Amino acid sequence: MKIVIQRVKEASVSIDGKIAGAIDQGLLLLVGIGPDDQAEDIDYAVRKISHMRIFSDPEGKMNRSIQDIEGSVLSISQFTLYADTKKGNRPAFTGAAKPDRASQLYNSFNAQLEQLVPVQRGVFGADMQVSLINDGPVTIILDTKYR
């Protein structure tokens, strides 16, 4: 799994002009599923994201987690994180998991994360418009293959 984690003041996702999900302070996650991803990758990602201390404490140090601040998550499926740009000018996305498998793992990831923090989500495979106000900005890339 490749996940772009962005600390946000607020974020929302719209489909066909209608808001499908929105959060106030929390994390915007762009979630890509690879062909070799398994339940262990989900476990690792959920544990890391829910405990990652990237929110400021009263002294201004990044010392608090999404759980500590009682924030929310907006989760967006993002197969383009597996783009291969080696040849030509048009990215290839053959490195991403097949849609059926990716959808299953993405839904499992969200369900597991939702046991720890409130989760809003986009619609898998839909054309979405994402709006956000970055906080910091703080942007972290988590790749479950490098643990």
From Swiss-Prot:
Name recorded for this polypeptide: D-aminoacyl-tRNA deacylase
Subcellular location: Cytoplasm
InterPro entries named among the record's database cross-references: Daa-tRNA_deacyls_DTD (IPR003732), DTD-like_sf (IPR023509)
Domain notes: A Gly-cisPro motif from one monomer fits into the active site of the other monomer to allow specific chiral rejection of L-amino acids.
Similarity section: Belongs to the DTD family.
Alphabetical list of Gene3D superfamilies matching this protein: D-tyrosyl-tRNA(Tyr) deacylase (3.50.80.10)
Residues spanned by motif Gly-cisPro motif, important for rejection of L-amino acids: 136-137
Subunit note: Homodimer.
GO molecular function: D-tyrosyl-tRNA(Tyr) deacylase activity; Gly-tRNA(Ala) deacylase activity; Ser(Gly)-tRNA(Ala) hydrolase activity; tRNA binding
Function: An aminoacyl-tRNA editing enzyme that deacylates mischarged D-aminoacyl-tRNAs. Also deacylates mischarged glycyl-tRNA(Ala), protecting cells against glycine mischarging by AlaRS. Acts via tRNA-based rather than protein-based catalysis; rejects L-amino acids rather than detecting D-amino acids in the active site. By recycling D-aminoacyl-tRNA to D-amino acids and free tRNA molecules, this enzyme counteracts the toxicity associated with the formation of D-aminoacyl-tRNA entities in vivo and helps enforce protein L-homochirality.
